[in-house]
Curated annotation (Swiss-Prot):
Protein name: Putative ABC transporter ATP-binding protein MA_1418
Subcellular location: Cell membrane
PROSITE patterns: ABC_TRANSPORTER_1 (PS00211), ABC_TRANSPORTER_2 (PS50893)
Signal sequence interval, chain numbering: none
Family: Belongs to the ABC transporter superfamily.
Residues holding ATP 2: 294-301
Coiled coil: none
Amino acid sequence: MIELRNFSYTYGTAAIPALKNINLEIRKGELLLVTGHSAAGKTTLALAMAGILHHEIGGKIEGNISFQSRDVKEFDGIKELSRHIGVVFDDAESQLIFTTVEEEIFSGLENRGHPEKEMVRRSKEAMDFCAISHLNNRAPHMLSGGQKQKVALAATLALDTEVLILDEATAELDSQAVRKVFSVLKRLKDAGKTIIIIDHNIEDFLEIGDRVVLLEKGEIKAIKSPSEFTSKSSDLTSTNLTSTSALQTDLPLSRTAEQPIISVKNLTQRYGEILALDNIDLEIYPGELVAILGENGSGKTTLVKHFNGLLRPYSGKVTVKGLETSTTPINELVKHTGLVFQNPDNMLFEDTVEAEINFGLNNIGVKGPEAVGAILRSLELVNLNDKQKVFPRHLSRGERQRLAVACIIAMKPELIVLDEPTTGLDAEESDRMMQLMRKLQQEGHTIVMVTHNLQIVRDHVERVIRMESGKVVEDSANRKFSGKGSVKEESDYKGHVSKEIVSEEIVSEEIVSEESVSEECVRGGTCA
């Protein structure tokens, strides 16, 4: 179906190839799993197989790629190739350009000249598959990260291509949504589709996979069956693609002060008729490490955007360090609260990695040798020491995620809020990220993070807040946490996949989109 022969690729003026001497044949009807560390070359491989490197990006290309025995260079650009190969990338936002979800899904079908009746049938089926029918008239950029991924997936499924490539396409989905994707992919495979899943967390799909490709530094390190891959722990743990942390479910609560750093009283947030937050009462104390869990659209991101004033209460009251957010300028609040967005690209706008970090430091008056020291320390903490002069958009998704964290921790806010901080990170990097959070906590910072990852919660977090439909339904110490709700728990996926469409609450986590917020604002710059 797709064959790569002695294929190597180097981006632009880069000195090191992103892919080196790749030899791989993807068979018709196969479900291939591709995994590896951040920056291993996974996304580049997806771009190569879809013909995007040849027809859109350019760069130094060696060897060849063929689709159905025809060199991809011979196709009439992406327009022709996309009739056969559908791709969903890790950054769903980059694929969403229309004003409503329905238009987003219709657009590809219209471009292919399908009759209206056929377009209606396909789009309805795709939206039902992805449980987003209730979002059909919503603006994609106003949806939560997980909802955006579902829309991008539905738009691609509607095209009914022979090949489907998913590049970290479930990274921001809750466990119910991942189970639904599992069910859909199984049906597509049974129908003879060729599917390529590129992900750090392939364990969710090993049951239906045919082969596993392990990438390391742009090269294929191993190709194995799923059973061989899981039976030999060296393939997983030696490359640190599974978590190696010991469970720490009896972590103590770290309340070191009587006065909360965050106080939320009777907080309600409405957007027209949509109730996004429903009468929330909550206190977070200095020195705590808190996780906020919940399904896509449960209100998690809406809640934490109140912690630095990006959102103002519809009713109720939020205070940060005693400052009421409804009356205190955001520029003042961000001195106390650092927020790392779910999508790191919404925070990155400078020409180099070091300039990204320096931007926030300059805004809070840190300059000269002190700024240099802060930059070097934050880069070392997130393991990006060798990337100071790199253009941020040339980093992998995982590296961009770590850079966004570095930009915030360099400013040393008392409260650090991270929205899905391990998205795009493999297990080793996720563990390292959480060890960093523990270190920052020990230095006196308060840490609040939104996550779907139950393993991370079990290993590192002291207190768990669970949300449903805009309400806090559980607030407990880790050791007492019920484990209910939408979290990524491995046992959820093995052999017990529901065939029913999972309904989702209409509440959007990002009704006020990250894109509508000035990037400079969260790092002490001008707030629009």
